[in-house]
């Protein structure tokens, strides 16, 4: 039976599965290898009852490895879930490649991850065997649940394999359309560029360290001639490459092209442009192998590294060249005028745990399904709000023991990520500063390191999302307390969210000083996550927007701005609406439109 983290699926309003793995009856066929690899097993993280681990296959030969297959067995430990491979067996275990990581080029490696239970033992390091392995070795690297080093973004991240697909985090734009009229693609479709020289597909890759990475482009070229591409990293400042993309014989026949590139530490914009008038082939996906990488931030592109083509007519082009300016749903719905103003969406309440699973084991996905469908149709990113919070969580958690709550938290995160794997950003933990609304139930489940454990789970099940520690007005109140809390999480978190409610009366200099201090001490990308100014006096609201918004937008370490509502009478803070229900703007909205939203 085949097991894959991507196989968890839950239709709306039905009983969720309580098993950790979903098994589907897919026969495993014999696989042929034309080379072999060194196979290693590494413990990433270990806690009192469980662990996470990576298995890495490194091709040290001169020929490619195709369709790998490996096995391992524990004495006492047992696997409970895994990602980036297809799994079978109940000890011994078997793992085979997924559609996008089945070929390992000479000198390159792939990794997949797993989580398990120790069953009273320590975390074991079993021998990895199989037709793909020329030597079976185990890693002596062990770590505890303490903060990981900067070489790994989190203890349970899958460091060396990243898949970027259309309409998901890290996919920035296509100069053309997203289509699904030719079979054989993965994900929701493929990128079909315009038939023009220079037509491009653009991705964002975040690397925790500078170095060599292997990019693999999956494509179909049903034409009679090559449709080669020019691959540019960060506008050419970090490399220009030519990618050969010969005909595949049919638009339903998919092949891969692999190229080694140099990425810099931090955000990298990767642009593949057509070198002929026919445009590019259909592009299914981009996979990245090597080092620790995750989906990058399309909205953080500077003018020096922004993409050159402006032929895209989709709404995603605004987000790819500038930081996004987003907003939330209105009374549980998305207004028809949303994308007229905003290019990022956050569900105000619909993605909170208490809204989705008010009754234990019964999910209400319908409102979120509508929001994600709208976002995909308009090619704008979604930020989930929020996984774990001391408010608006299911009341039935109060009746459970700590271990039972731990199981429920993992199932909630797992099932959300399985249903919405293209979630760009997640407020993983909300308002955890003491005195705000920390999640006591999570501390009961995981102990004092509960924040790190929740982020570990989010990394495991949503490996391509940007994971955010979000909190209330940390610009004005409990500023130092938030900094201390964020610093303590180290590399478990990807970014911090500054809600920015209640800034009325603060000067531009005061706001900038606070943001600078958070960046200087925490060193993580910043998102302004819930900005509003509540005042029925139009001029007071306008003056505060004019003071604060330029600071947010021009700050080099603020990657995006989300406002918390925009329709008068239908916002959380009274007086914070920006347009009337009929669309008439207040002065602050007119100023936003003229200076930012229509730029």
UniProtKB/Swiss-Prot annotation:
- What SUPFAM superfamilies does the record tag this protein with? (Trans)glycosidases, Carbohydrate-binding domain, Galactose-binding domain-like
According to the entry, every stretch annotated as the GH10 domain falls at 315-595
Q: Which domain of life is it from?
A: Bacteria
**GO molecular function annotation:** endo-1,4-beta-xylanase activity; polysaccharide binding
- Presence of the UniProt keyword Acyltransferase in the record: no
Q: Which residues form the active site?
A: 431 (proton donor), 530 (nucleophile)
Question: Could you tell me the Gene Ontology terms of the biological process aspect for this record?
Answer: cellulose catabolic process; xylan catabolic process
Catalyzed reactions:
Endohydrolysis of (1->4)-beta-D-xylosidic linkages in xylans
Gene3D superfamilies hit by this protein: 2.60.40.290, Galactose-binding domain-like, Glycosidases
Membrane-spanning ranges: none
Q: Which UniProt keywords apply?
A: Carbohydrate metabolism, Cellulose degradation, Disulfide bond, Glycosidase, Hydrolase, Polysaccharide degradation, Signal, Xylan degradation
- Give the EC number(s) under which this enzyme is classified: 3.2.1.8
**Where do the CBM2 domain residues begin and end?**
38-136
Q: Which Pfam families match?
A: CBM_2 (PF00553), CBM_6 (PF03422), Glyco_hydro_10 (PF00331)
* CBM6 domain location: 163-289
Q: What is its EC class?
A: hydrolase
Under which pathway is this protein filed?
Glycan metabolism; hemicellulose degradation
Residues of the signal sequence? 1-37
Q: Which cysteines are joined by disulfide bonds?
A: 39-133
| Cited function | Xylanase B contributes to hydrolyze hemicellulose, the major component of plant cell-walls.
Q: Which family does it belong to?
A: Belongs to the glycosyl hydrolase 10 (cellulase F) family.
The record, for PANTHER family, names: BETA-XYLANASE (PTHR31490:SF88), GLYCOSYL HYDROLASE (PTHR31490)
Q: What is this protein called?
A: Endo-1,4-beta-xylanase B
**Organism annotation:** Cellvibrio japonicus (strain Ueda107)
Please name the gene that encodes this protein. xynB
